[in-house]
Structure formats: C-alpha cells, structure tokens
Amino acid sequence: MKRRVVVTGMGAVTPIGNTVEEFWNGIKTGKVGIGPITKFDTTDYKVKLAAEVKDFVGKERMDFKAAKRMELFSQYAVAAAKEAFADAGLDMEQEDPYRVGTIIGSGIGSLSCVEPVSY
C-alpha cells in the first residue's frame, strides 16, 4: 500500500531564527548560529561553542502554564508545530485532532535532565 505524506505548513525554532521567516532570512544572509555557550558554565569543559537557540520566550508562543511545565526543547517543538499549523491555515479549534499531525526530531532531548545524572 502506498502512503502519501503531505507537507502543508512549516515552523522553525533554530540557532539562526525562531520562525521560518527569520530562519530563511538567516540562511540567505549567511547568519552564523554558532557562538559562545551561554546556557551553562563552560569553565570545566573544553568545548566553549555551540549552536544555541537565542531570544526564545516560550510563554510568548504558547500558554504560560503549559510552557512552565515543559522542558525548553519541548517548548521549541511546540512553538514550531504551532507555527506550522498556522502556516498551513489550520484552526486547531476546528480540526479533527486525529487527522492532523506533526513530526518533531530531537537529537538528545533535555540536557537539563541528562546532565545532573551523568556524573
């Protein structure tokens, strides 16, 4: 059985832009998303650079209470998914939630949860 996948909307939260428009403009202008690590103290580490998401405020992109309960990487995913739904012209109040989906990739998940138990 052949199955078709249809991409109808896009969303982005990246080191070079927190929306699709910002991301695309960053690509076109050659914006560099790599810089000094700011999310934690790097004194005891050799690596000092990373591609961190900057200037992201989750409570501006989703329900404040929901954002407060989520790890930051989950907030990125929800914000990008909401942008993709809006880009597709979907009103989630009107759509059948069983007919709408999104694919989200995360290479490692929540470092704030992994790091404290890794030593």
Sequence positions of predicted segments:
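Conserved "HGTGT" condensation-loop signature of ketosynthase/thiolase-family condensing enzymes
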Residues: 1-119
